[in-house]
Amino acid sequence: MTNIRKSHPLIKIVNDALIDLPAPSNISSWWNFGSLLGVCLAVQILTGLFLAMHYTSDTATAFNSVTHICRDVNYGWLLRYLHANGASMFFICLYLHVGRGLYYGSYTYTETWNVGIILLFAVMATAFKGYVLPWGQKSFWGATVITNLLSAIPYIGTDLVEWIWGGFSVDKATLTRFFAFHFLLPFIIAAMVMVHLLFLHETGSNNPTGIPSYFDMIPFHPYYTIKDILGFFLMLMALLMLVLFSPDLLGDPDNYIPANPLNTPPHIKPEWYFLFAYAILRSIPNKLGGVLALVLSILILMIVPILHTSKQRSMTFRPLSQCLFWLLVADLLTLTWIGGQPVEHPYIIIGQLASILYFSIILLLMPLTSLMENHLLKW
């Protein structure tokens, strides 16, 4: 008789994805971040669900409801800080996951890669909407500034912004709809994760060498289940250390001041995980140009598979491309730093140079270096 896990219609799906799935024998810890992102999403949905039970999406009571959660709800402080810092953990894992894909050439699985980029956009949209909900100063002014960027769209811009706001400024209608979308999007993300995995399992995983591993596969369980569980423990330990020892380390003290439309904070900046894109936005002195650069800074990942000129898939055996990759990482860290600084000399010019370098590396230097490596290897 066939084992139930191989014959039952539902259990069979789980079996093919988590138990009997053939996986390359040499995938490193960089392949752990996919499962870690799944854990992050689960943590965010669970903590968010319990927070939503006590939160009120009304401008008059939103700030006080968050205070009430922290002070009066059993372990409400823990839920709130797990959710806030869980978002930071989510983005750390996301950026490492995308970085792994770039380094090892996983983007050659174009369907998986493109669904992943749509997921990245969806997570960014969700995080932005979530940041507005506590209705502090940074929430209100962040929502005002970022939604206002859409007014740069020619002809329909102003109407579009007022349509999103539900009025002539960020107000009660805006907060209510942002809460609705912030609640809805994670479930759409969860569905898209399934599509992401569906496309991945069509091709199988890549591996550090970039060479097909059809002849050297091992079952996912127990080898990679135990490896993933170790990753879960390490990540959750890091998250709990952050939440229990310094919960406000990555936040902004201005958000403990209730939203006041009559008082603009001296420096309006997003959470740390958006600073690199914010720096690119600010580096162009034209509003529409800045918005286009902001969108393209993420959208550019979509054309990375087209720009792949190397005869090798992975960067493992390509030292010149490796140097460029780490230059790109350093450049993104520089942009993150610049995004948090005021708009004054020398930060303006550093931001502009870092932005030019970012697009140059991806569009020009990487493809040319790959061609040069092909030539050096006489390919």
Swiss-Prot record:
GO cellular component term of the entry, any: respiratory chain complex III
Protein's UniProt name: Cytochrome b
Location(s), subcellular: Mitochondrion inner membrane
Function: Component of the ubiquinol-cytochrome c reductase complex (complex III or cytochrome b-c1 complex) that is part of the mitochondrial respiratory chain. The b-c1 complex mediates electron transfer from ubiquinol to cytochrome c. Contributes to the generation of a proton gradient across the mitochondrial membrane that is then used for ATP synthesis.
Organism: Otomops martiensseni
Gene3D superfamilies per record: Cytochrome Bc1 Complex, Chain C
Further remarks about this protein from its record: Heme 1 (or BL or b562) is low-potential and absorbs at about 562 nm, and heme 2 (or BH or b566) is high-potential and absorbs at about 566 nm.
Main location: mitochondrion
Protein family (similarity comment): Belongs to the cytochrome b family.
Topological type in the membrane: Multi-pass membrane protein
Bilayer-crossing regions: 33-53, 77-98, 113-133, 178-198, 226-246, 288-308, 320-340, 347-367
Subunit structure: The cytochrome bc1 complex contains 11 subunits: 3 respiratory subunits (MT-CYB, CYC1 and UQCRFS1), 2 core proteins (UQCRC1 and UQCRC2) and 6 low-molecular weight proteins (UQCRH/QCR6, UQCRB/QCR7, UQCRQ/QCR8, UQCR10/QCR9, UQCR11/QCR10 and a cleavage product of UQCRFS1). This cytochrome bc1 complex then forms a dimer.
Binding site for heme b b562: H83, H182
